[in-house]
Amino acid sequence: MITQEHYCALPAPKIRTLKHLRTFEVTLDKHGLGPVAGVDEAGRGSCCGPITIAACIMPQRPIAQLQALTDSKKLSAAKRAELYPLIKKYALAWSIIHISAAEIDREGIQHANIFGMRRAIEKLDVAPGYVLTDAMKVPGLRCPSLPIIGGDAAVRCIAAASVLAKHSRDLIMDDLGGKYPEYGLEDHKGYGTKSHMDAVRHHGATPEHRYSYSNVKAAHDQWLQEKTQ
């Protein structure tokens, strides 16, 4: 039987077709280690809004409607929006967790990310027998897990989780863009672009900003200084 130790030495498979995208999941499942859950996050590098983590268990069969599935960063916003309900429809189980900016400031991004991944896995309606993540180790799980570098482009369940996380978070950032129109959050999704930091320097940070991030703190402090002069 293939064990976790066997897999720790394996690189992510070279992807050419959707069949290759399912290689890790199918092999683990055939050796009695399924069901296999994929986990990924969106918004870790952002300085505003939540970090969003999704977990997903996909059926071990080809799904024609998901032929376009790959790493969410390689898909257009329109394609992610198209795949989002289809993934929910065909997945055996899925979950989405949002960790707020306030919690990120309180606990740190690394802790928030790992905690969110554990929570997303625990929230699945189907208990996984094995968990595959996109490069990040997640301690404290009830089943074996394996981080795969480039997993969001190499493993179907991770790719599915990446789309769920990215699109779900984008919807939140679109809503925050309407709530705080001065910052253009619906465009840059909370990442530290020049226009975003200029807006923080001009208007100050919102409650949705991550004050523990140095770029937010510097821009917000500049706004405070100019405000008090």
Curated annotation (Swiss-Prot):
Describe cofactor binding as the record notes it.
Answer: Manganese or magnesium. Binds 1 divalent metal ion per monomer in the absence of substrate. May bind a second metal ion after substrate binding.
Question: Which InterPro entries does the entry mention?
Answer: RNase_HII, RNase_HII/HIII, RNase_HII/HIII_dom, RNaseH-like_sf, RNaseH_sf
The record's EC number reads 3.1.26.4
Which GO BP terms sit in this record?
DNA replication, removal of RNA primer; mismatch repair
Keywords (A to Z) from UniProt: Cytoplasm, Endonuclease, Hydrolase, Manganese, Metal-binding, Nuclease
Gene3D superfamilies to which the protein is assigned, alphabetical: Ribonuclease H-like superfamily/Ribonuclease H
* Family matches, as PROSITE patterns: RNASE_H_2 (PS51975)
Q: What is its main location?
A: cytoplasm
Q: List the subcellular locations.
A: Cytoplasm
Domain annotation RNase H type-2: ranges: 34-225
Catalytic activity annotated for this protein?
Answer: Endonucleolytic cleavage to 5'-phosphomonoester
Alphabetized SUPFAM superfamilies for the sequence = Ribonuclease H-like
Please verify whether the record's keywords include Cytoplasm.
yes
> A Pfam family this protein belongs to?
RNase_HII
Q: Where does a divalent metal cation bind?
A: 40-41, 134
Identify the HAMAP family for this entry. RNase_HII_B
Explain the purpose of this protein: Endonuclease that specifically degrades the RNA of RNA-DNA hybrids.
Q: What is this protein called?
A: Ribonuclease HII
UniProt source species: Corynebacterium diphtheriae (strain ATCC 700971 / NCTC 13129 / Biotype gravis)
